[in-house]
């Protein structure tokens, strides 16, 4: 696309430069009279103008018809979606631990269920003949720089900066949200207001 547009701009520049000489001789790019056709310079100038118009028309069109020009959205009917799922308490506890998100009330659970229901629309998308993408970089060779040590042995100094270490490894601190026990959580959900 860039090559065609760049070529089109060069042709437009050339036609602009030639067009001024044609204009002074009484020829425009829109019409050619029989008298002007006798002059080869004027006729070639008008041919360039016509060629530029054609190239510009074809270069501004989108060449890939698979990609729509405007985003499209079709509503998905409820009967096309899989049945709604109820999230078990064990899964909610695990999600809270992994994502550090607090679902301590009925409103948080309802928001999570709505998000899952919205994502269920992906089941309707036709993916026949589409290979799953394993990695974004699956077609590229990754060139890594040499692993050269820039400074001296500083592993001991870095490990002293951490509060918790096991052997030669940092220990990640637990989540910043204190999670209640399962019994406390069930009691909170029963007494929470929606």
Swiss-Prot record:
What is this protein's record name? Glutamyl-tRNA(Gln) amidotransferase subunit C, mitochondrial
Q: Which family does it belong to?
A: Belongs to the GatC family.
Give the keywords, sorted: ATP-binding, Ligase, Mitochondrion, Nucleotide-binding, Protein biosynthesis
What is the organism lineage in this UniProt record? Eukaryota, Metazoa, Chordata, Craniata, Vertebrata
| Source organism of the structure | Salmo salar
Q: Name the job this protein performs.
A: Allows the formation of correctly charged Gln-tRNA(Gln) through the transamidation of misacylated Glu-tRNA(Gln) in the mitochondria. The reaction takes place in the presence of glutamine and ATP through an activated gamma-phospho-Glu-tRNA(Gln).
How it assembles, according to the record, is:
Subunit of the heterotrimeric GatCAB amidotransferase (AdT) complex, composed of A (qrsl1), B (gatb) and C (gatc) subunits.
Q: Where in the cell is it found?
A: Mitochondrion
Cystine links in this protein are none
Q: Which reaction does it catalyse?
A: L-glutamyl-tRNA(Gln) + L-glutamine + ATP + H2O = L-glutaminyl-tRNA(Gln) + L-glutamate + ADP + phosphate + H(+)
């Amino acid at each position: 696309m860039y090559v065609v547009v760049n070529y089109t701009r060069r042709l437009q520049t050339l036609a602009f430069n030639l067009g001024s000489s044609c204009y002074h001789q009484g020829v425009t790019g829109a019409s050619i009279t029989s008298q002007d056709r006798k002059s080869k310079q004027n006729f070639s100038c008008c041919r360039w103008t016509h060629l530029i118009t054609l190239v510009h028309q074809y270069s501004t069109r989108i060449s890939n018809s698979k990609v729509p020009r405007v985003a499209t959205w079709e509503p998905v009917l409820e009967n096309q979606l899989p049945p709604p799922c109820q999230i078990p308490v064990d899964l909610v506890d695990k999600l809270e631990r992994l994502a550090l998100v607090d679902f301590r009330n009925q409103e948080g659970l309802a928001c999570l269920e709505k998000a899952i229901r919205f994502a269920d629309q992906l089941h309707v998308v036709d993916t026949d003949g589409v290979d799953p993408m394993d990695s974004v970089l699956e077609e590229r060779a990754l060139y890594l720089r040499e692993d050269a040590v820039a400074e001296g042995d500083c592993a001991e100094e870095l490990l002293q900066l951490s509060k918790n270490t096991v052997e030669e490894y940092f220990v990640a601190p637990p989540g910043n949200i204190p999670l209640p026990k399962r019994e406390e959580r069930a009691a909170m959900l029963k007494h929470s207001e929606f």
